Amino acid sequence: GKFAEATTFQTGSNTWQFYDSWPPASAEKKALYFREHGKLSFARPEENSDNHDSYVSDPARPVPYRARPVEQTYGPGSRWYPWLTEDQRFVHNRPDVLSWETDPLDKQVTVTGNIIAQLFASTTGSDADFIVKLIDVYPDEVPQDIHMGGYQLMVADRKSTRLNSSHT
């Protein structure tokens, strides 16, 4: 038989999905917009709205990709594989991490297809890293030490760039 063009595991429904094309023909393009006060919305902001944010990065204190201490990568007791789905609340209150959240969703949202983060940024440094994560946020009453073995992070990407003085 013919193999699917793309096969994905949908964590919310705990099912495998098989697609004849990628992105799936049935996928609807939706945009999420940064809004004031850390809000994220499917509604496009007004043209004259000032939806920018800023932070100061300290290269001597980089943002960790997982909570400290970090165990050995492989071997007995290694938690290397599940770090992809670890709770990210440990960095939420850092002054060099920006976060936006939607209001609680009133219906299920499935994210499938090509995901693009469009950022407009400037830096006073000679290089910068911007990391964008799309995360399903747990309610505050969920403990921080839950384990989601077998689930995969839906989006995690890193783009590095070197800037020169002619770019702002």
What residue ranges belong to the model's regions?
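C-terminal, loop-rich substrate-recognition/catalytic regions characterized by aromatic stacking residues
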Residues: 1-162
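Single conserved hydrophobic/aromatic residue that forms the stacking wall/gate
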Residues: 163-168
